[in-house]
Amino acid sequence: MLDFGALPPEINSGRMYAGPGSGPLLAAAAAWDALAAELYSAAASYGSTIEGLTVAPWMGPSSITMAAAVAPYVAWISVTAGQAEQAGAQAKIAAGVYETAFAATVPPPVIEANRALLMSLVATNIFGQNTPAIAATEAHYAEMWAQDAAAMYGYAGSSATASQLAPFSEPPQTTNPSATAAQSAVVAQAAGAAASSDITAQLSQLISLLPSTLQSLATTATATSASAGWDTVLQSITTILANLTGPYSIIGLGAIPGGWWLTFGQILGLAQNAPGVAALLGPKAAAGALSPLAPLRGGYIGDITPLGGGATGGIARAIYVGSLSVPQGWAEAAPVMRAVASVLPGTGAAPALAAEAPGALFGEMALSSLAGRALAGTAVRSGAGAARVAGGSVTEDVASTTTIIVIPAD
């Protein structure tokens, strides 16, 4: 503690009047009171919630454990609320102490007036006539000194008592900090144990079923049960393979990079398809009967150069085949029908067909159809022959002859 008695009243009074006053202390007291109210409300809410859960909807060992874990925290909230309320009350006491000390302190203007009077009396004390007044002024100044020192001593003691607060404690640890990591480890261990136990169980079942299945196969009378046993064995094998090669197994995860290689190969294959498509869609020279259209490969009809003069035509020069009007070239190209004997000298005339077999394979109606087919084939071949343009006139190809062989019936 400072020795306020050794300090003149100018310093003590100046310090008291230079500060912000009791306003910050009163604001701190109000803040502490608000915090205490919120903590009391939180403690009441916690308590009512836990009581409501453990009484009706949630009962049993878990609810008891949870209530026991939360109880220390609720108690800490209540204790902290009381401490906050006490801090607010002490802040109010400190503000009151300051007001008391401020009222007991001599105002600085009074001290300044005393000092000014003393200087004036000393300056005018030529013959000693101001000596009593100077003594009275000094006595008044000593009283102000003592008054400020007493006020400061009282304020220091009271403020020290008001500022002694109980230390706040940290909230208790109601949860296990390593619970999350432990839970993750337990879950992973349980998952691995479940997977390994599943595969082990399937293998054990397969090994136990294999002897009985082989024994049942040795007996023909139990074929049905043997097939049922094999079904069980195959099902066990399928389950084991599914666990080993599933989408989330090590083998399944190892196949993921292969998909990228497959996609990369398909992208490279796209570049190799371009030359084949270009060769397929590219222009080609016309051949055969389409060779006259070769100038069109450039895509422009104007590239065709006329071959000789223009084509000529005539009117009223057609001939008739029955009631059908056909070009003259058809009649000129039609072959002359000759007998088989004239074409093949070694072949004699065909014997007369028996009248009693009109429905035979080589009857009159069948033979007449052969002759009709010969005429039709000649007309079709003559009409379907490719025409050539030369010198402005159309010339027909020479029609090929058709030989008809008549086989006598037995």
Swiss-Prot record:
Its main location: secreted. Keywords: Cell wall, Secreted, Virulence. It is found in: Secreted, Cell wall; Cell surface. It comes from the Bacteria. The keyword DNA repair does not apply. One of its GO terms (cellular component) is cell surface. It holds the Pfam family PPE. InterPro entries: PPE_C, PPE_dom, PPE_sf. One of its GO terms (biological process) is intracellular magnesium ion homeostasis. Disruption phenotype: Cell envelope-associated glycolipid phthiocerol dimycocerosate (PDIM)-positive mutants with simultaneous deletion of PPE31/PPE32/PPE33 genes have a growth defect in Mg(2+) restricted media, particularly at mildly acidic pH, but the PDIM-negative mutants grow normally. Belongs to the mycobacterial PPE family. Interacts with host Toll-like receptor 2 (TLR2). Virulence factor that modulates the production of host cytokines. Interacts with host TLR2 receptor at the macrophage cell surface and induces the secretion of the anti-inflammatory cytokine interleukin-10 (IL-10) and the pro-inflammatory cytokines TNF-alpha and interleukin-6 (IL-6), via coactivation of MAPK and NF-kappa-B signaling pathways. Also increases the expression of IL-12p40 and IL-32 through activation of the ERK1/2 signaling pathway. Can induce cell apotopsis in macrophages via activation of caspases and increase reticulum endoplasmic stress response. This is PPE family protein PPE32. It comes from Mycobacterium tuberculosis (strain ATCC 25618 / H37Rv). The gene is PPE32.
